[in-house]
Amino acid sequence: MRGEREFRKVRAHGAAVRDPLFTLRLTDYRPRYGERWHPRAIIGLVVSKKTLKHAVKRNRARRRVREALRTMPPELLPGGLPACRAILMLNPGVLTVPFPELQAALAQALQRGAGATKRGGAKGKGGKKGGGQVAGERAGNESGSGRVSAEVNPTSASPASPAEKS
């Protein structure tokens, strides 16, 4: 993954799968602007300085996970890696766990996450109960922000023509 914007989108809209070794956030695959449709797994690895203090350990953790994904046995993940955009936030346990266990944990998380990806925007967020506005309802001033949305009926929006009045 490239750029803060892609990471922000996955963090905001991605489904989370937690494991003692890492946290996986993933969304459905969508090509970048101007890119051809080529479904594949695009995974960004994140290791914070708070999690692993030394750069050598952070780099070793990244290399271990990258190699575990690259050499994933087909029996662990039939069909290969799912087409998705994902962020793997690594924990210190990645350095000490045996390699086959790391691969098994990654495969299990990817399988769980592939079925749980969220689609669309963040509709449930914003503080109002009940989610978004239902078609035909008028949104009141529930948030206290001073903004009111009014219902617009497309048939009554334009004045009646002289032919319709008679």
From Swiss-Prot:
Biased composition regions of type Polar residues, renumbered to the chain: 142-159
Residue segments, region Disordered: 115-166
GO biological process, one term: tRNA 5'-leader removal
Keyword RNA-binding: yes
Protein name per Swiss-Prot or TrEMBL: Ribonuclease P protein component
Highest taxon above the source species: Bacteria
UniProt function note: RNaseP catalyzes the removal of the 5'-leader sequence from pre-tRNA to produce the mature 5'-terminus. It can also cleave other RNA substrates such as 4.5S RNA. The protein component plays an auxiliary but essential role in vivo by binding to the 5'-leader sequence and broadening the substrate specificity of the ribozyme.
Keywords: Endonuclease, Hydrolase, Nuclease, RNA-binding, tRNA processing
Entry's EC annotation: 3.1.26.5
